[in-house]
Amino acid sequence: MPHAKTAMKAIAKKTKAKRQHTRMPDNSSSKEEVSSIEEDSSLKEESQLGVTETLVWDLPLRLFHWALSLSLVGSWVTAEAGFDWTETHFLFGYTALGLISFRLLWGLLGTAHARFSNFLTGPKAVINALGQLKQKTPPGEVSHVGHGPVGGWASVVLLALVLTQAVSGLFISDDIFYAGPYNSAVSSSLADYLGWLHHTNFNILLAAIALHLITITWYLLGKKENLIGPMLTGNKNISPSLAHRKTQSKTQPMTQPAVYSNPLWRGFLIASFVLVMIVLLVNLAPEPEYF
């Protein structure tokens, strides 16, 4: 009997131990879930703590962006509309050329985040930025104060494509109805080449614009970061970690407002200069040759 009692006690201990063992994962998993929820909520609170709304994109830059978008759409529509819209197509081309000229000057003389020196980086930074595209942006924050390494070079590529499109259009001709203002200034073979470039570059430009729109959509749906809103209002929510970074040129800390002075007078002067240059460019073109 003593042996039987001892055996019964041993069985009872093993059964109790098994019950405790089977219950432990449930308790630990529930604790892990709770701690994970608490950690996520604390990270969210920390990410929103100290976030300040800062004016990043100045008004001249925003006006340029949307005016260029309209001119590109207008150029495309009038090119497809036929001969009756040829003059309007050229007007959209001149507008695009003027806008690109303004942006190039604004990239040298404009406010902090409009300047090329503040967002054009080396290949290492671009590769690192590409690897971070899959990461979600913390709620209420942004990935970069101004252009990121990828976005900076993407904007330069788009500017180069639009510039190529506008300049080549000055020399093209269909040999029957219309000709660019400087068609007679070049040889027929060069004009033919520039005509080919104008049409080929347009397809490349369309692909680049499509990629641009896809990237914006990915940021909105994948990274949960709205890029369209700041280009309308100019404002971004800047976290403390981003606020203490330096610009690429290391001339202005991010703790200072991106638009540290009223840029409107400077933008107006540059826009006026560009307008005069475009008008002179068109009106001083050589007279077309007639046979």
Question: What is each residue range found by the language model?
Answer:
Residues 2-291:
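Membrane-embedded alpha-helical bundles that constitute the cytochrome b-like, heme-associated redox core
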